[in-house]
């Protein structure tokens, strides 16, 4: 399923899925109708199946895309940036749907949204310039930044020794930075537990240097 879906705006979800099923070679009409009805239930669009696609929200269109991808019961489904641009509620709904799909087939998620990976994936790979820079579980990627994450409060200047500033928060008496690097000697540095994002950033720092 691509990030930008090529839907036909004047078709209903029912008509669109029927058309795509025919293109996929599902020629038995009764079997096609049954499969489409089941998929619409799974993606929670059965009650709006006869509405034109141009009236759907972005999240609803993504769910139509997933239903289309599942036509014909594929063994592998690839989704590209599935939650990009969605509001938090629809993002959670779509992640849960992909989790349900993953119980029936292999789902490959291509995304830059770290939260989607941490919530949905047990195995992951980091691709850099066409090469696999990392392959393993989320915990293994997080471990890349173990001992490298620090919280530092300053008057506003970036703390010395910080390789990367991950985030900064302005407070009433200064600025708190979350940084990656070796700040063990910094008097105001407090060690913090690494996140998946920290692990990814630290990994890529090493990859770029190489």
PLM regions: where:
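Conserved ABC ATPase "signature" region
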Residues: 18, 22, 30-48
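Conserved ABC ATPase signature
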Residues: 52-56
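Hydrophobic anchor residue at the start of the ABC signature
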Residues: 66
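Conserved catalytic motifs of ABC-family nucleotide-binding domains
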Residues: 73
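Catalytic Walker B motif of ABC-type/P-loop ATPase nucleotide-binding domains
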Residues: 77-81
């Amino acid at each position: 399923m691509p990030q930008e879906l090529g839907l036909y705006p004047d078709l209903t979800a029912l008509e669109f899925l029927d058309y795509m099923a025919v293109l996929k070679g599902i020629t038995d009409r009764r079997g096609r109708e049954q499969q489409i009805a089941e998929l619409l239930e799974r993606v929670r669009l059965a009650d709006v199946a006869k509405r034109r696609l141009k009236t759907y929200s972005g999240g609803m269109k993504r769910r139509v895309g997933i239903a289309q991808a599942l036509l014909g019961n594929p063994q592998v489904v690839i989704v590209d940036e599935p939650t990009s641009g969605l509001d938090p509620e629809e993002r959670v709904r779509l992640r849960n749907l992909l989790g349900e799909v993953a119980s029936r087939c292999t789902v490959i998620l291509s995304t830059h949204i770290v939260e989607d990976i941490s919530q949905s994936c047990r195995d992951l790979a980091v691709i850099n310039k066409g090469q696999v820079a990392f392959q393993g579980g989320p915990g293994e990627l997080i471990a890349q930044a173990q001992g490298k994450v620090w919280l530092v409060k300053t008057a506003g200047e970036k703390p010395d020794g910080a390789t990367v500033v991950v985030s900064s928060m302005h407070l009433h008496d200064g600025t708190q930075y979350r940084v990656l690097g070796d700040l063990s000697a910094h008097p105001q540095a407090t060690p913090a537990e690494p996140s998946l994002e920290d692990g990814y950033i630290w990994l890529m720092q090493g990859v770029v240097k190489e």
